Regions:
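Acidic, mature catalytic/reactive cores of soluble proteins
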Residues: 1-249
Length: 249
């Protein structure tokens, strides 16, 4: 659509100018607010690819520089959230370390995290999120508050559902991301921790399989709400055993 052409504007000066970016988006919105012209334009595939690649590279570098947080003890990870009041969620907040797994998974998987940053993230996750007896990597540290401006997770006690449980699909995606970036030992730790927890019937109280999550006492819950088993199989086959194509080949 002709209206979309403006979105392919490729200019580093624009990317660094918040006001100019908002003006461009407003102009695009105005052009298609009530109707679409129906006109089309041709953009060379190479030009579109270059524009999208430059946008992604700028964005990733921006995240590396502005969203990296540390605990003052040599550990670091990415802040992945802002609450509904526009406040940074992760880092050391009120002298309390706050870390969430999801932002680390996608920064690693997408290639945003550098190798040095991945090493720091895995070290931090082992320190703040890992709980061997209940399946491995929790979704988040305990915030010690009911933070209603961050979503449904605080509708649960710590260790249940999205609030600090070992959420299987995110733990498997963490493993998958680590394998993709060459951190096989760290990825295997995440996979084996889930497996060992699931097979420990005396604690998990489940038939063999991958539950949606393991709670604070290590019990596995809600197999029927997750697709984590398929992620697990995909990771074992394509990453652990390496049986996969390359970019569709």
């Amino acid at each position: 659509a002709e209206e979309m052409k403006i979105l392919f504007t490729d200019d580093n000066a624009l990317y660094n100018d918040i006001k100019a970016k908002n003006e461009l988006l407003e102009k695009y919105g105005e052009s298609c607010r009530h109707n679409i012209s129906g006109k089309t334009v041709k953009i060379p595939v190479t030009e579109a690819a270059k524009s999208l690649r430059n946008k992604s590279e700028w964005m990733m570098e921006h995240i590396r520089k502005t969203e990296w947080v540390t605990d003052g003890e040599g550990n670091g990870w990415f802040n992945g959230y802002y609450d509904n009041n526009g406040r940074q969620v992760e880092g050391v907040i009120d002298e309390q370390v706050r870390m969430m797994l999801t932002g680390e998974v996608f920064s690693i998987m997408a290639g945003t995290a550098t190798e040095d940053q991945i090493m720091a993230i895995t070290k931090s996750a082992d320190k703040y999120l890992y709980a061997k007896d209940i399946g491995g990597y929790r979704l988040n540290t305990d915030f010690h508050e009911i933070k209603t401006d961050l979503g449904r997770m605080f509708g649960f006690a710590y260790g249940e559902k999205e609030n600090g449980a070992v959420f299987s699909h995110m733990a498997v995606m963490y493993a998958n991301a680590l394998y993709k970036r060459g951190f096989a030992a760290e990825g295997y730790k995440a996979l084996s921790s889930l497996y060992n927890a699931a097979m420990n019937f005396e604690v998990s109280r489940i038939y063999p399989g991958i539950p949606e999550y393991f709670n604070a006492s290590g019990r596995g819950l809600y197999h029927y709400l997750t697709g984590a088993a398929s992620w697990y199989m995909l990771t074992v086959i394509t990453e652990v055993f390496g049986v996969r194509g390359e970019a569709g080949d």
